[in-house]
Amino acid sequence: MKTEVSKKLMRVIVFLSLITFGINASAQEYVAPTKPPETGRSPGVKVKLISDAGSTKTYVLIFAPGDEVMSGLKEFALKYHVKSAHFTAIGDAQRAKIGWYDRSKKMFKVINIDYPSEITSLIGDIAIFNGNPVVHGHINLAAEDGTVHGGHLLEAFISPTLEVMMTVEPVQLNKQMDTEFNLSLIDPGLEQ
């Protein structure tokens, strides 16, 4: 009888341990480097042309609360027929997903930032791959205590704002697939 009670008690302890600790023991999420961002998730973005120096144009893009960054940048590139651009930005994110490139898997390990953060730096470029504009961004996000996480930007939802300075160049830059790394990389000599 005492042994049966001990076995039942041990099962309950194991079960409760699995519930308590198993919630955080989920499988690591990975994403393919060539996965395009979803569009339609940035309805509040405002755009203004602030410089038109010949064929090079500079725009300011202001994101509203709730707008998703990669979606808004992709939509801008499509609407304005961007063939080559570079950008910088600062602002705030409510939450974000960044990626760290795992060479052994040839994929991005997803790092979730589930708390409000200062976007202390966002830089990137836009180039053409298979006829479509591809946004490539890297971001630094600072937590309340000043700790900074950075990596490849997968998604970031803005609150209260993001201020992007976007320079669009007239010469098309093209990307091609690097099969060794499973990445689409800019090739300045590639003409399409």
For the regions a protein language model found, what residue spans apply to each?
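Bacterial N-terminal signal peptides that target proteins for export
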Residues: 2-13
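Bacterial N-terminal signal peptides
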Residues: 11-22
